[in-house]
Amino acid sequence: VIASLDHSGGQGTSAYHQQPLWAPSRVPEVNSREVPKWMEQADVDEVIEGFVNAARIAISSGCDGAEINAGQHSLVRQFLSGLTNHRDDAWGQDKTLFARTIIEKVREAIGDAVIGLRLSCDELAPWAGITPDMAVELAPQLAACGLDYLVVVRGSIFSVEKTRPDFHEPEGFNTDITQRVQEVLNIPVFLQGSIVQPHMAMSAVEQGVCAGVEMTRAQIADPDLVNKMLADDVAKIRPCIRCNQTCQVRDARNPIVTCVVEPTSGHESTDPNWYTQVASKKVAVVGAGPAGLEAAYTAARRGHLVEVYEQRNAAGGVAAFAGPGGTFVHWLYEQCVALGVRFHFGVSVDETTNLGADVVLQCTGSRPGVP
């Protein structure tokens, strides 16, 4: 278990804490339009000590190590970048000094525990920001300070939409830069970049692109993803469709992180086990859209005999045609078939008045919602 250590610096808003944002230079936050405070030496020292103390707390709490964030939303990246670091003192003349100092002092504080770095290797702002070529030179300098691994990410204050893109962006967009960084380092490098399909993750590792792959959203959609991969049961992995509807976590209100395709995710401590085996009943489900398929899947897993009635000639409802939704409903349909669920297509609602079932679930009539 690795604790993530972060300070967002000049990115964000003072609306909640009512204190000025801190940053290397007074570069406006393009989203909140706030101008941050230029960090004085005492401020710099305080933040460095904060990272050190946080690392100590993480280790004393049982974590195996700490990961320092120099990614898209981080103060550490802001010191590394010419976009946001315009200082003429030591912290600006050597833009790596802040990051190197934090890594070295954290290493002194936690000894042999694991230390990782999350590094933005492309700020997508070539006029002044960190570019892939710069990152290839930068990574070895930072690794030499005592890193055990490095995670390649991308983005900056000027490219927030690229931080955690949805399905409009191709999967594995950081593959090329990750491989370049891996080639110049002798520590493990991890690939991050909207990879949600197991075969893509395995391919990246097998081809030597990286030592491992981050699959955060994929594991929100299916918390058992790793276990299913180890058991060679990939077909049963509930697919993440990268819709970004309920899994976004950068929210000061601290909402529950859950998932559109797996609504029980995030509610494990309060919801019952929906798949507990019970006395078998005959269950009829009217409608084979996402709701009907999920109801049929859940009922079948609980041991019921399930039959689904759908007016159209295929399952999935409107979701089958909406963006990446077809991927999910196709998976759900295949899982239902594998569980023995019987489907009856071309059956109108009027024809489902006498089904002879113990339980009838009406799952028709979807309504449009605001994303």
Language-model features, listed with the residues they occupy:
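A broadly tuned "polar low-complexity/structure-edge" signature
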Residues: 261-264, 334, 343
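FAD-binding core/adjacent interface of flavoenzyme oxidoreductases
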Residues: 243-251, 339-371
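Flavin-dependent oxidoreductase catalytic cores
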Residues: 1-286, 290, 294-301, 367-371
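C-terminal structured "cap/appendage" subdomains that terminate the fold
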Residues: 202-213, 220, 314, 320, ...
